[in-house]
UniProtKB/Swiss-Prot annotation:
Reaction equation(s) it catalyzes: UDP-N-acetyl-alpha-D-muramate + L-alanine + ATP = UDP-N-acetyl-alpha-D-muramoyl-L-alanine + ADP + phosphate + H(+)
InterPro entries, per database record: Mur-like_cat_sf, Mur_ligase_C, Mur_ligase_C_dom_sf, Mur_ligase_cen, Mur_ligase_N, MurCDEF_pg_biosynth, UDP-N-AcMur_Ala_ligase_MurC
Cell compartments where the protein resides: Cytoplasm
Protein name: UDP-N-acetylmuramate--L-alanine ligase
Gene name tied to this protein: murC
SUPFAM superfamilies: MurCD N-terminal domain, MurD-like peptide ligases, catalytic domain, MurD-like peptide ligases, peptide-binding domain
The keyword Cell division belongs to this UniProt entry's keyword annotation: yes
Similarity section: Belongs to the MurCDEF family.
Pathway: Cell wall biogenesis; peptidoglycan biosynthesis
Annotated EC: 6.3.2.8
Biological source species: Pseudomonas savastanoi pv. phaseolicola (strain 1448A / Race 6)
An annotated Gene Ontology molecular function: ATP binding
Amino acid sequence: MVENQRAMPQPEMRRIRRIHFVGIGGVGMCGIAEVLLNLGYEVSGSDLKGSAVTERLESFGAQIFVGHRAENTVGADVLVVSSAVNTSNPEVATALERRIPVVPRAEMLAELMRYRHGIAVAGTHGKTTTTSLIASVFAAGGLDPTFVIGGRLNAAGTNAQLGTSRYLIAEADESDASFLHLQPLVAVVTNIDADHMATYEGDFNKLKKTFVEFLHNLPFYGLAVMCIDDPVVREILPLVKRPTLTYGFSESADIRAINVRQDGMLTFFTVLRRDREPLDVSVNMPGNHNVLNSLATIAIATDEGVSDEAIVQGLSGFQGVGRRFQVYGELPVEGGNVMLVDDYGHHPREVSAVISAVRGGWPDRRLVMVYQPHRFSRTRDLYDDFVQVLADANVLLLMEVYPAGEEPIPGADSRNLCHSIRQRGQLDPIYIERGVELAPLVKPLLRAGDILLCQGAGDIGGLAPQLLKSPLFAGAKAAPTEGKLK
């Protein structure tokens, strides 16, 4: 029987009244700020420009500053910063001079988690979707979890929500190794891949050891939920000296999926659990990678005593996450329509998973892909992998690399990617120079029934809504808006 609606303990941050966020509009920062606002703390924050996110926080009572200035820190008891902010920032420099504590966002998240039943989701890919699925299933089970997610949960219309139960569900970010601040009771590792390697001095073994260290932050009575299908997770499994529960397609998994069938956006499968009856479920997301994300959720929900009925309901009613295979609507073309999809994937493994999902759900449709590589360093380090997976589209348009603050690296750009893909002989990609309007380029390439995928972690996120509103696609139909998480 699930323990329901236990009063959530408040963080005991003595002497802390006003909390200032440097870069409050960031996806990892705004959620924590929103939870703290709802807990009754005074919250202020600065960012280089205003956004819908900062407007939302302002409507909840946050004081928002546009631009970083020393005077923004007046009255702050602590500064919260992301890994992108350094000591040259005038607000950080002023705080250090005045002996105001400056803490990374993960340390503040750890403080919120300290007095709760923390569930932390780690892994190179799938963190946001898995965290969102867990929150949705717990909500369906009558629990009211607090969650902090790295994407917008469509059913809630936000990436964070303060609940009344003891559960706090959050992403654990390995990109800067800040997940080592967290001390959850349950931890998920979805997979381990070569990404953000600068943090680990280019040493993959160091990355693996850091994941083991993260899992050893669990208490001896905690639980590590691990995807046994991932070869690196399988490699570190014997090193984890905590209780473990494995999931995957493998016959050796504790929680296993069989009979997977995909029909468009819907994926159906049967779950096998030790000493339990088989459970038939469906999830409103395509692809085997989302079956794995669902299995992690089922493993945790089962262990926490959530009923099978709530698990089935939470998965089938899941409305997705912003920019994770998000269907924006339909674009009219001669003879019919094109399905417009936006996706955040920016690693070859993520790109491959999405392409496989399209092929599985819509096997007779062409995939027209607009892709924007993210970071020159990632493009350089994974160049051959990008060439291989991007060549699997039917039509490919490559935007220039989104730098994310990096300087260009010779050879690690979209022109060279186009050249290398063209040499494979599978398709002839189109290079898109920065600043070129995309709608006139894309429209002549589309046919009725196509799937148009806009993918990447940079400013390509604004392309799908732009196409939907373009006069060249007059009569475009937007997808239904989200509901509320209950």
